[in-house]
């Protein structure tokens, strides 16, 4: 009976997740896996890890085809001011600065 109870306890899924719902600093393959929705890679040779989104006046990336960013996208409510190009989307080099569009309209 004790073995059955232990087996059930270990079978209950961890809410943190192994493949999705990953915390900052955990290794990822795509931004969809991260709670923050940013899978960040320092260089093409480094492992990608979940990271916080970019804050106001920080460097940011526009949406990328791959779901892995060299610069994280902006936090909710902010806009990444960047000149988007097709080549930049493919090469993951569409970088800009996060700003609050609502504040700049005032």
UniProtKB/Swiss-Prot annotation:
PROSITE patterns: COLIPASE_1, COLIPASE_2
SS bonds (residue pairs): 28-39, 34-50, 38-72, 60-80, 74-98
Entry's family note: Belongs to the colipase family.
Signal peptide, first to last residue: 1-11
Provenance organism: Equus caballus
UniProt-recorded name of the protein: Colipase A
Cellular component terms (Gene Ontology): extracellular region
Tissue specificity as recorded in UniProt: Expressed by the pancreas.
Domain of life of the native organism: Eukaryota
Organism ancestry: Eukaryota, Metazoa, Chordata, Craniata, Vertebrata
